[in-house]
């Protein structure tokens, strides 16, 4: 998914059919971009309204589809936030278990190199000073040096694909959770016919092991995305 809607009909042969297929693809991309822009905009404005400081951090950086949106909105708000892009930049890895399996998650897909990501961001007006790009395999996230990881986080955008990746992301976030932080999952409802989505399964497991916080559902978006507000118990 990656909030990119699946094509309901394969491209038929012939130039006219090919053109129609391309038009449908462009329409889906526009809907996806609008949904992401809306949720990131709502989240950043809510954080600004509530006075929650901290950075924007995204995990999963395919095609630089979300960080430029965050930068665009960030520029319009009083509370400026540094932008972090953290990914392996190697595409979808091999599945580590059955919860990593999904009909659209194929090993090697969704590949964008770090250089291509940075180039896309510059092209969309994101200055190098506004962002930090971190290249790191997901199993090594907790071993990042202190200058290579964000510590004060306000908004997290989780756009990696596999359950195992999301588990590593959540473990990095565990000691950095705070009252008012927002977490957005791009693939929260990406179920398969056999089991719940990797994002949802990982987040539910994480919630059961987190005593100091609970998570209030905020907004759904697109056809598979969902967001949550982090709340301290009795806050």
Give, region by region, the residue ranges found by the protein language model.
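Conserved alpha-helix/loop element of class I SAM-dependent methyltransferases that forms part
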Residues: 38-51
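S-adenosylmethionine/decaboxylated-SAM
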Residues: 8, 12-34, 52-235
């Amino acid at each position: 998914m990656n909030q990119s809607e699946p094509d309901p009909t394969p491209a038929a042969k012939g130039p006219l059919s090919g053109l129609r297929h391309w038009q449908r693809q462009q329409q889906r991309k526009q809907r996806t971009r609008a949904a992401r822009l809306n949720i990131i905009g709502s989240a950043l404005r809510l954080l600004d309204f509530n006075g929650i400081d901290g950075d924007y951090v995204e995990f999963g950086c395919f095609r630089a589809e979300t960080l430029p949106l965050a930068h665009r909105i960030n520029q319009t708000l009083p509370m400026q936030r540094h932008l972090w892009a953290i990914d392996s930049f190697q595409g979808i890895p091999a599945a580590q278990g059955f919860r990593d399996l999904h009909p659209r998650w194929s090993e090697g897909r969704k590949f964008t190199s770090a250089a291509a990501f940075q180039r896309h961001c510059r092209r969309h007006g994101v200055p190098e000073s506004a962002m930090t790009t971190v290249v790191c395999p997901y199993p090594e996230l907790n071993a990042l040096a202190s200058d290579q990881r964000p510590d004060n986080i306000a908004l997290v955008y989780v756009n990696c694909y596999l359950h195992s990746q999301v588990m590593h992301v959540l473990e990095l976030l565990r000691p950095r959770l705070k009252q008012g932080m927002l977490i957005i999952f791009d693939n929260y409802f990406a179920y398969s016919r056999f089991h719940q989505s990797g994002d949802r399964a990982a987040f539910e497991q994480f919630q059961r092991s987190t005593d100091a916080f609970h998570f209030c559902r905020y907004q759904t978006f697109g056809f598979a995305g969902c967001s949550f507000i982090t709340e301290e118990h009795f806050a």
